[in-house]
Swiss-Prot record:
Residue ranges, annotated region (Disordered): 289-311
Region annotation Interaction with pAP: where it falls in the sequence: 256-275
Span of the signal peptide: none
EC number: 3.4.21.97
Protein name as annotated: Capsid scaffolding protein
Short name of any one Pfam family annotated for the protein: Peptidase_S21
Region entry Interaction with major capsid protein, spans: 504-524
Keywords assigned: Host cytoplasm, Host nucleus, Hydrolase, Phosphoprotein, Protease, Serine protease, Viral capsid assembly, Viral release from host cell
HAMAP family given in the database record: HSV_SCAF
Enzyme class: hydrolase
InterPro entries: Herpes_virus_sf (IPR035443), Peptidase_S21 (IPR001847)
Gene Ontology molecular function, alphabetical: identical protein binding; serine-type endopeptidase activity
Keyword Phosphoprotein annotated: yes
């Protein structure tokens, strides 16, 4: 296994503050360093795995190029990696080491000597460079590759002057062919320490991606910066110039491999995949937020001496003074709300028991023949009086089922021609009785003179006579066939007391549920 080259910015000018700040004057005084700068793992002593070949002063900050050549490092990482980490990628040992180093130690950290008050920096300011997970300075991301040119190429904002000077000094460095040997036990401890010390680092890969953008790295091959386990195939990695470019040739797309959809439609599909939280969860979150705000607003209670009988008068304290005296937690309220929601669901399910009655579709309306009489007789109208013309019912139309509360009543006094009329009984509510006039095919009924001259009927009789009635058609001659009497359904809402409209039931259940919830919540 040959050497691995690493490069990157040690700092960016005017981007850090405090003791991490490096100005152009300090860097100019510290370069070139008095001796070779070792490269170790996470600033651990006696854990050198390489050395810095050259450091140049770029317009953006100090930039270094180093070499890592430790055979034991590749052996330890190769034994630690899982068998499925590389997937189906057929890689050499050198490429495996490049992938592991790029994603396990993607940053660099410059260690410098702390200056005394009034001390001027000199060539001994820089101590060493450590490979780590996340550096404290801005833009300290590194790139590993098999050659110096390929390691420097992804830094697109590096000036041409600094690039050429860096490669020239690295070619003359005596440490380019040096090999560093360490015990595998010490390397294992150093790598494990790095993992343990950074296991609580929040948004690790987001920080790595941000540092990569700050350093101007584009076209890298081995740094994945992904949150998923395993490595992406080479077709997903961006190619880098140099010897590594031949390894990252993406396959050509075959017809039908991609589907192009608008961005708005894609975003809508992604949003719809997320299941909405349940109503109980939302209510529980609201209750918890309200309790949290109340705890924050309430001032801390003053210390008081313990009392023999002390009730929970401080809502900011959730601890119980005596068994059974703890304030009710917010989970109880959430349980009550869940119970109320189950009651509402039960009430809404009642509408399934009363389906909406079905009526056959009516034929296009037609006008009555000229000789037909439309309307129904009324005791206060003269004989032969007619109502305004209306549309006649068509064959095949079905009327709503008869009301079970309607009963036959005897003939009304003074109206002998209305025998056998059906009228609602007195105990039926007014809103259940049909109020629309019933259209029938009938002949004009003549009212006798005695009935016309008779005094006005009693209020009860008048109310019964004013109610809508259904008059039977006069009997036709025996020779002519009698057409069936068809009822009109001009008012589909005309239903009996035994049939409940589904929409009405839903409204009634909804109102009842709302009243029930409001009463229960007011008591809580």
């Amino acid at each position: 296994m040959g050497p691995v080259y690493v490069s990157g910015y040690l700092a960016l000018y005017d981007r850090d503050g405090g003791e991490l700040a490096l100005t152009r004057e300090i860097v100019a005084a510290a370069l070139p360093p008095a001796g070779p700068l070792p490269i170790n793992i996470d600033h651990r002593p006696r854990c050198d795995i390489g050395a810095v070949l050259a450091v140049v002063d770029d317009d953006r900050g100090p930039f270094f190029l180093g070499v890592v050549n430790c055979p034991q490092l590749g052996a330890v990482l190769a034994r630690a990696v899982g068998p499925d980490f590389f997937g189906d990628m057929r890689l050499s040992d050198e490429e495996r080491l490049l992938y592991l180093l790029s994603n396990y130690l993607p940053s660099a950290s410059l260690s410098s000597r702390r200056l005394a008050p009034g001390e001027a920096p000199d060539e001994t300011l820089f101590a060493h460079v450590a490979l780590c997970v996340i550096g404290r300075r801005v833009g300290t991301i590194v790139v590993y590759d098999a050659s110096p040119e390929a390691a420097v190429a992804p830094f697109r904002q590096l000036s041409a002057r600094a690039r050429s000077e860096l490669l020239a000094r690295a070619a003359e460095s005596p440490d380019r062919e040096r090999v560093w040997h360490m015990s595998e036990e010490a390397l294992t401890r150093a790598l494990l320490s790095t993992a343990v010390n950074n296991m609580l680092l929040r948004d690790r890969w987001e920080l790595v991606a941000a540092r990569r953008r700050e350093a101007g790295v584009r076209g890298h091959t081995y740094l994945q910066a992904t949150m998923w386990a395993g490595l992406l195939p080479k077709s997903g990695a961006s190619p880098a110039p140099g010897p590594s470019a031949a390894m990252a040739a993406p396959p050509s797309a075959a017809p039908g491999d991609y589907i192009f959809v608008p961005a708005a439609q894609y975003n809508q599909l992604v949003v719809n995949q997320r299941p909405a939280p349940s109503l109980e969860s939302q209510l529980g979150a609201i209750v918890s937020a309200a309790m949290d705000r109340r705890h924050r607003r309430s001032p801390s209670p003053e210390p008081r001496p313990p009392a023999r009988k002390r009730r929970y008068d401080d809502y900011a304290q959730d601890n119980a003074y005596y068994p059974g005296e703890a304030p009710p937690p917010a989970s109880d309220l959430a349980a009550v709300v869940s119970s109320l929601q189950r009651e509402i669901s039960h009430l809404r399910a009642q509408q399934l028991r009363y389906p909406t009655p079905y009526y056959a579709p009516a034929a296009p309306p037609q006008l009555l023949p000229p000789g037909a009489v439309v309307g129904h007789p009324h005791p206060h109208h003269a004989a032969g009086a007619l109502y305004p013309p209306m549309y006649a019912p068509q064959p095949g139309l079905h009327a709503p089922p008869p009301s079970p509360v309607a009963h036959a009543v005897p003939a009304l006094p003074g109206l002998p021609g209305l025998q056998g009329l059906a009228a609602p009984v007195a105990h039926v509510p007014a809103q259940v009785v049909p109020q629309q006039p019933v259209v029938v095919q009938a002949q004009p009924v003549a009212v006798p003179a005695a009935a016309a001259a008779a005094p006005a009927p009693a209020p009860a009789a008048a109310a019964a006579a004013a109610a809508p009635v259904q008059a039977a058609a006069p009997a036709a001659p025996a020779s002519a066939p009698q057409p069936p009497v068809q009822a009109s359904v001009s008012a589909p809402a005309d239903v009996s007391a035994g049939t409940i409209d589904a929409s009405s039931a839903a409204v009634a259940c909804q109102r009842g549920a709302d009243i029930f919830v409001s009463q229960m919540m007011s008591q809580r």
